[in-house]
Amino acid sequence: MERRAAGPGWAAYERLTAEEMDEQRRQNVAYQYLCRLEEAKRWMEACLKEELPSPVELEESLRNGVLLAKLGHCFAPSVVPLKKIYDVEQLRYQATGLHFRHTDNINFWLSAIAHIGLPSTFFPETTDIYDKKNMPRVVYCIHALSLFLFRLGLAPQIHDLYGKVKFTAEELSNMASELAKYGLQLPAFSKIGGILANELSVDEAAVHAAVLAINEAVERGVVEDTLAALQNPSALLENLREPLAAVYQEMLAQAKMEKAANARNHDDRESQDIYDHYLTQAEIQGNINHVNVHGALEVVDDALERQSPEALLKALQDPALALRGVRRDFADWYLEQLNSDREQKAQELGLVELLEKEEVQAGVAAANTKGDQEQAMLHAVQRINKAIRRRVAADTVKELMCPEAQLPPVYPVASSMYQLELAVLQQQQGELGQEELFVAVEMLSAVVLINRALEARDASGFWSSLVNPATGLAEVEGENAQRYFDALLKLRQERGMGEDFLSWNDLQATVSQVNAQTQEETDRVLAVSLINEALDKGSPEKTLSALLLPAAGLDDVSLPVAPRYHLLLVAAKRQKAQVTGDPGAVLWLEEIRQGVVRANQDTNTAQRMALGVAAINQAIKEGKAAQTERVLRNPAVALRGVVPDCANGYQRALESAMAKKQRPADTAFWVQHDMKDGTAYYFHLQTFQGIWEQPPGCPLNTSHLTREEIQSAVTKVTAAYDRQQLWKANVGFVIQLQARLRGFLVRQKFAEHSHFLRTWLPAVIKIQAHWRGYRQRKIYLEWLQYFKANLDAIIKIQAWARMWAARRQYLRRLHYFQKNVNSIVKIQAFFRARKAQDDYRILVHAPHPPLSVVRRFAHLLNQSQQDFLAEAELLKLQEEVVRKIRSNQQLEQDLNIMDIKIGLLVKNRITLQEVVSHCKKLTKRNKEQLSDMMVLDKQKGLKSLSKEKRQKLEAYQHLFYLLQTQPIYLAKLIFQMPQNKTTKFMEAVIFSLYNYASSRREAYLLLQLFKTALQEEIKSKVEQPQDVVTGNPTVVRLVVRFYRNGRGQSALQEILGKVIQDVLEDKVLSVHTDPVHLYKNWINQTEAQTGQRSHLPYDVTPEQALSHPEVQRRLDIALRNLLAMTDKFLLAITSSVDQIPYGMRYVAKVLKATLAEKFPDATDSEVYKVVGNLLYYRFLNPAVVAPDAFDIVAMAAGGALAAPQRHALGAVAQLLQHAAAGKAFSGQSQHLRVLNDYLEETHLKFRKFIHRACQVPEPEERFAVDEYSDMVAVAKPMVYITVGELVNTHRLLLEHQDCIAPDHQDPLHELLEDLGELPTIPDLIGESIAADGHTDLSKLEVSLTLTNKFEGLEADADDSNTRSLLLSTKQLLADIIQFHPGDTLKEILSLSASREQEAAHKQLMSRRQACTAQTPEPLRRHRSLTAHSLLPLAEKQRRVLRNLRRLEALGLVSARNGYQGLVDELAKDIRNQHRHRHRRKAELVKLQATLQGLSTKTTFYEEQGDYYSQYIRACLDHLAPDSKSSGKGKKQPSLHYTAAQLLEKGVLVEIEDLPASHFRNVIFDITPGDEAGKFEVNAKFLGVDMERFQLHYQDLLQLQYEGVAVMKLFNKAKVNVNLLIFLLNKKFLRK
């Protein structure tokens, strides 16, 4: 069945009954509402440009507010930014349904429609949408919004679809039921236009008349009349354009006709008014705006058609379009973008259409984005060029990484390479553009990736980067990948690159080089094969051709030597074949090269020999003996026995030999020389060239002497010369004769000289005088030589003389210094102090102080050597604490086991009594009941004594311990719940979980939860600091509520009680500041006093009231009273900081720190306003306004504050509130502007108050809680919680576990897996209690003793060893640097110590040892440090070097920076010496206290264990039969049962491998042991002992606790555990 196009007429109802008419009416209402939904859906689709659900589903899709918020963004983007819309993709909504944060979307939409000015008459409530309380009102608001936006030209017009759409009968019925279910009435959708018109603050009658005139003019169809009617000022129409008058007429006429037609389709004709057929003022304005927009779009299209940026800009700035963000300088961008959009639309539609307004707006936004990006890119490129010119690599990389530059990824590690390459490119090309930078950076980044792959030895990454097109490398071959990799690695190693990178040129050069090498190797192999083939062919010419191939790489291959090459290579190949035994053996390249070299050497030798022989022949022909002798000694000819003295003989002999060979007709030029290897070398005497083959057709010269012939002639001549030397035997006689002749000649010459002297005596005297002068000069020179020989002695004498002079001068200066010693001391002290200050400043502030500065202050460490011992003691105490904790954990586990055993014994005793009382009623047929009665704690709930329930209980205890001590889980859970359930959950579960902070531990943990939750809420929900003030944050609300009750209430009473009481007791106090109120009060008093009516008007404005001096006087008095009272309140508040609850102050501190961290750009004033809002407005202000509600003052029963009292408190609260928020009076409170100075002054006081309030210690210090607190505490924490709260908490954790613990390795998941599925309330309380008929089982309370499943501290031995190693190294280094000079650590450790240094070091160590001897015994536990200090300096140096290698292996120090990290550690120790000592002392005290507490806990556990042991023994002894009844010292008798008897009792189930017929032959003897609870079971078969079994009563109870029904004896007999316990109880134990 489908709904007809039009509703039924009134005639249809004449034939229907009352019920049918009522049903028809409901169907009609449902159809009308569905039509409105369809209209709203289509209008929203037009606005949002996306498809929406069907009308029947639209209501549900609106509840999360996403569509509404998107709609708000369409017309008010500044109010509803897209990024603020929660769950914009609706993924969260589709997964888990509605969330409380979806209400934010609804509020955004309401803010948007309020922002544009839609009358509040149409506004729905948030709950109308979120809870679906009144969806028709929401649709009504959407319709009103559509008409309002249409009037403003911001949205299309909504269309009336009544009677035009069809719905199924099921849809109509469902909608009618839905409307009837909520009892909702449809709003009058048709009256929206009239309501909007009535909302105008103008003369409604004039507007109505003008609108009617317009409608009538439109009906007449006269354009001029219509335009005149539209221009009537009473019509309040805007943006009228005369050129469009005809279009207005046509559009309005069409709209009026459609509206009239739609009105005729409606059934409720009696309720229709004139505006159902006439256009309203809003509709007329909307159509005008629509026409204006269309006309403006045509202008835009015309500008695009003309390609005119100026015309387009003017068209875009048309107010009718109301485009956002149009900028004059982007006209070209607009033209380009809108042209592109226009062409794309034409292609899609197949024809040219005008762009819609939204499309133009989108194009403007896109063009703005592109323009901004382009401008930002150009600015970024300018900055990059400037940075490149500055040559600061870090700045260049920073600018390159700027996103606005639109460049590929940049890697800062290669900053120097970017700087260098880009600087070179900039020098070559000038200012770099974006495209050039893009290509360059892309290439350089690819080069960086290649370098990083090389550094990491990553071959695959290297190859992928190398073949990347961005790298731009040419001729990269895949088969050479490994060669490229190896070659580049080798290049990096050769250059010794550390942090430097290979450049692109290096990469390309290496690639080309590798390619060339590869090609060269290929060609070389081919050339070698061709050479071998030529040798096989036996052709010297082919061999020469192959040798001359460039690829072979053979040098000095020449044509004349070709036969020799071929001969030698063939011989070498033949020899290789013989040696290897391979006939096909070939010569390798090196062997070929050796053959070529040998052939060239042979040719050179033969050539030089031939030249030498030719030279000899030529010299012989010239007849010059000396020339002949010289050429004979030519080494190239290698002639033997050539003697220089035989030159003439050689000449004669060789001339004779040549004459004998001379032939008259011999004119040939070729001669033959025989070589040593039997080959012949042919030499041309004219060209001096030789060859290895005889030239064809050329005769040889026979008259030319050969080398052999020349050698023969030389040998003969030399032999003859040797014979001639025999005459040397008579040489002595010749010498004697010559001596006598020489003596005669000398004597003759002497006589002649004497005669000459006598003749020339004056000349002789003169000569003697010259001789004496010479002698005197010689003596002088001798003295001079003597001085030179004794130079050291002379220098020493001179030094003594100079020393005397210098000493005299020194003594004079020393005397001067002694006279001015005070001034000198001051100067030196000032210099040393200044130097020490500079060094200390470097030590304190420098990140890496030099070693020389550290050495200057290293002596400070000597004064605190006990610090190192204390550190060792600290480590020892930590280890002892860990061991103690583990020991206590083991004791605790043992106590738990003993506790279970005691419980089993007690429960067994109770069960035994029940069994005995019913034992007589049992028969053979109901033995199973006996077994059931022996089951302990059957169905008694969570705390029943069974293993399964025990594990469930422990799992809950572990879970709630984790929730209590790890606040992040509850903090996240709070924000996963709907907002209306959060407060209930907090009060019902969380405050119970923390026992309402009744102890130090719970107060500390609850405060940690508040801190974590507040940080989580600010992180996820707060977009700006002011949101905390304007909103109502969940955590802030809960914190204030918690701390304002109980102790917080008493604090409020202490702070505000006295001043509030003063206000209440002052009956004449007047603080009214309203001028009108004061004015009326004055008139009333005047009339009451005079009895005459005042002539003044009663109703006046504030300004008129203030014109009367009496009113001003009263206002001044009220203001003085208000300021005086406010000062009292301010003083009470600001002087009571310490009385504000600590938790409240700490939360304020966390709020301040968290806001400052999330909003670093926020000013201190903004943050202080938020914190002040928390401390004053939320915590203190309610107590000021309503003290009776917070029991600040005592009120009589039924009493209340009087109105004047409440007004006075409200006035004070308002003033304090303005002061706390820093808000001044303005606007309607102009008369209070005199208080603004006071508010500003008071605000500064509030800021100081807030600052002091936030200065609180951390909770760990406040509550004396640390990581050992739970381990030291003897009593375990307990919580009391109802079963319903337990189940609800478990359910919530299961539902939201993935949100609050995303990591599946989180401990929460493990604990939830331990708990398993969600239990029911009867499962937790037990079926027996559930059957008792409690009205509300969920309110039954259970107690949980919280325990930590993950408790335990792992002592990190490696960490302790590392710290000890570092500590020892630092101490050794501190000792070394005080005695060794040097600027670096390596230099100091490599120097040898002198005797003086060793002595000074030994003296210091002796003093330290004496100091250590006085150290108390508890600090002497680690003696290794003391032992190290006694080592000599050389050994300490070796120890430090070894330790440095170990520390470097651990990654703590690095040799690259000279172990600066260790020097920094020493500097840090010196800086933190005093602070560290106090902190370590406090840590030692804390650990000692912890150790003492653990010892106390250990003693408690041991005592409790002893007590439990005694109690168990007592229980067992009590169960044993009384010794009096059995006789003292008498042993209890044994029981004897056959297997058949035990089978009949149900105790025995079966015996494996033994039929039941033989059971009568098996006897079981049960004998009590010496200790209570122990039994010995002896099995006999046919009277023969077979097996013995020790049975422990507690083991049986443990099996029963674990739910084991059957156990084995002797590994064969199966017995019923419950019935066996019953049998032992009955026969051996007391009843």
Curated annotation (Swiss-Prot):
Residues 1004-1253 form the Ras-GAP domain. GO terms for molecular function: actin filament binding; calmodulin binding; GTPase activator activity; myosin VI light chain binding; small GTPase binding. Keywords: Calmodulin-binding, Phosphoprotein, Repeat. The keyword Lyase does not apply. The modification Phosphoserine is found at S539, S1424. Pfam families: CH, IQ, RasGAP, RasGAP_C. GO terms for cellular component: cell cortex; cell-cell junction; cytosol; lateral plasma membrane. The keyword Nucleotide-binding does not apply. CDD domains: RasGAP_IQGAP3. PROSITE patterns: CH, IQ, RAS_GTPASE_ACTIV_1, RAS_GTPASE_ACTIV_2. Residues 730-759, 760-789, 790-819, 820-849 form the IQ domain. The modification Phosphotyrosine is found at Y162. GO terms for biological process: ERK1 and ERK2 cascade; G1/S transition of mitotic cell cycle; gene expression; mammary gland epithelial cell proliferation; mitotic actomyosin contractile ring assembly actin filament organization; negative regulation of gene expression; positive regulation of gene expression; positive regulation of mammary gland epithelial cell proliferation. Residues 34-149 form the Calponin-homology (CH) domain. This is Ras GTPase-activating-like protein IQGAP3. It comes from Homo sapiens (Human).
